[in-house]
């Protein structure tokens, strides 16, 4: 606990006018776990684009009144955001809208470009004027430039994919089409389904399809472009080359909702397997197994089932406060832990506790949780982590941007155990990650430093905005 996801996207196209904004609203609600800084919806009503975007949760930004001001339409795209490039400002709220000579479009993007600065430099030299510090605007401008030289919006997206490096799962709405695209490595999830009235929907996770009553069809393949219009859907599978699929393994460990299925793998089942492996790797005599809500619960259940130690609900989560991993400020993170989790004393008092969590990044949150359990009377605490230690930055859309902030880069497992105040500490072995999804097709660069794409020197989350600020001085 202590990391955050980047974004969630949702799109819909229908053959006749309907309240598409309301459907996107429910879809974004189901994706709220993927981003809690801001959200937005853009509706296309016969070529007229109307949007509502702001900082805050879906429930805060979209009221009955604000939704009523969004028109009925045939297409809409929505987004929930945690900023992995660019700051937390209203300008960076998505979807990003762009006008061009051949029309207008709105783009929502999940992921992170590793060559965003290089692309932005070239665009600015050619006269582009940027209004945000988000790499999504860079994607939108590249598509716009390519659109002026191609016969269709899908051709423009195809050409753009040849220029982008890094992670992107995106949904684009133009005047007449909805486009969905997933990068050639498939770093971030993207799937689509269909509603009973024939509407097609696209979402970051299958749980969002279920939320709006859509039937899941399948995940987009790495490098695939789907084109939706009033006649239906056409797949343009390209840009795959010889690349091996590299879906982020942390989607399964932490980011995704447990009721989602990504690339035919149940997130819930993968977390159960992680807990079982931890029980095999690090057996211990204990009285109760407790998971840290929410993403540690399934792994805790797997550990309990495999070890035979009873499973207990020892931590209660306040559902009305955001994930600590999604709190950009360290002070906010500390304050939120104190009010977010509450120990169940009769489950913990006098017990030897196995505590299961999904990760340790800085150690800040973990220390607070251990203190909660100690104060509730835990006699022993044996911490088990359903991921390997974080040792490297992520450049593909996760907020792990500096080794200096990663506790495992500077301390051994035994030292970390002492710093956290636990009796023992064990991480999932990196060699076991493939067992979670029964495949070796995943990205684990934050654990092993093996980046599937070229990474520009000194690329950081804050470099994008810092460089832009330096230019203005």
Question: Which ranges hold each PLM region?
Answer:
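Secondary-structure transition/capping motifs at alpha-helix termini
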Residues: 128, 149-150, 283-287, 305-312, ...
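A conserved beta-strand->alpha-helix junction
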Residues: 132, 137-141, 311-322, 419-437
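Conserved short alpha-helical segments that host acidic/polar catalytic motifs at enzyme active sites
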Residues: 1-222, 227-286, 292, 380, ...
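PRPP-dependent phosphoribosyltransferase catalytic core
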Residues: 161, 176, 213-219, 371-473
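Phosphate/diphosphate-binding loops
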Residues: 159, 207-208, 215-216, 220-224, ...
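Generic beta-strand/beta-sheet core signal
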Residues: 108, 173, 181-182, 193, ...
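Short, glycine/charge-rich flexible loops or terminal/linker lids adjacent to PRPP-binding catalytic cores
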Residues: 308-353, 364, 391-397, 401
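Flexible loop/turn segments at secondary-structure boundaries
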Residues: 84-85, 115, 187-188, 209-210, ...
């Amino acid at each position: 606990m202590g990391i955050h996801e980047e974004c969630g996207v949702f799109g819909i196209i229908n053959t006749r006018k309907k309240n598409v904004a309301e459907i996107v609203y429910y879809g974004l609600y189901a994706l709220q776990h993927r981003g809690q800084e801001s959200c937005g919806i853009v509706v296309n009503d016969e070529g007229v684009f109307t949007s509502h975007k702001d900082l805050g949760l879906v429930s805060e930004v979209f009221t009955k009144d604000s939704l009523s001001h969004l028109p009925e339409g045939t297409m809409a795209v929505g987004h929930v955001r945690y900023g992995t490039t660019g700051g937390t400002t209203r300008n960076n709220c998505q979807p990003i809208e762009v006008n061009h000579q051949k029309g207008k479009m709105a783009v929502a993007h999940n992921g992170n470009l590793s060559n965003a600065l290089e692309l932005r430099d070239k665009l600015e030299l050619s006269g582009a004027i940027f209004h945000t510090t988000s790499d999504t605007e860079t994607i939108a401008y590249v598509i716009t430039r390519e659109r002026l030289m191609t016969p269709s919006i899908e051709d423009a997206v195809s050409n753009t994919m040849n220029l982008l490096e890094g992670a992107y799962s995106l949904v684009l709405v133009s005047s007449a089409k909805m486009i969905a695209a997933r990068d050639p490595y498939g770093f971030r999830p993207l799937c689509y389904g269909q509603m009973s009235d024939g509407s097609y929907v696209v979402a970051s996770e299958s749980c969002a399809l279920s939320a709006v009553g859509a039937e899941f069809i399948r995940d987009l393949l790495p490098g695939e472009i789907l084109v939706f219009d009033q006649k239906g859907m056409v797949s343009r599978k390209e840009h795959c080359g010889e690349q091996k699929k590299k879906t982020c393994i942390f989607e399964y460990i932490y980011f995704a909702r447990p009721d989602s299925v990504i690339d035919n793998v149940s997130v819930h089942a993968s977390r159960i397997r992680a807990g079982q492996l931890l029980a095999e790797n690090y057996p211990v005599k204990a009285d109760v197994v407790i998971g840290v809500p929410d993403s540690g619960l399934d792994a805790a259940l797997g550990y309990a089932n495999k070890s035979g130690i009873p499973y207990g609900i020892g931590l209660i989560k306040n559902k009305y406060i955001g994930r600590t991993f999604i709190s950009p400020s360290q002070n906010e993170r500390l304050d939120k832990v104190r009010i977010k989790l509450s120990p169940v004393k009769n489950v913990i008092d006098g017990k030897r506790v196995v505590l299961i969590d999904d990760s340790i990044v800085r150690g800040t949150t973990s220390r607070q949780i251990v203190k909660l359990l100690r104060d509730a009377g835990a006699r022993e605490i044996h911490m088990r982590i359903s991921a390997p230690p974080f040792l490297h930055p992520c450049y593909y859309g996760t907020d792990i941007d500096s080794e200096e902030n990663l506790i495992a880069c500077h301390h051994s497992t035994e030292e970390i155990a002492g710093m956290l105040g636990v009796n023992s500490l064990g991480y999932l072995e990196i060699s076991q990650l493939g067992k979670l999804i029964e495949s070796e097709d995943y990205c684990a660069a934050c654990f092993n430093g093996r980046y599937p794409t070229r990474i520009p020197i000194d690329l950081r989350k804050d470099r994008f905005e810092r460089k832009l600020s330096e230019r203005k001085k």
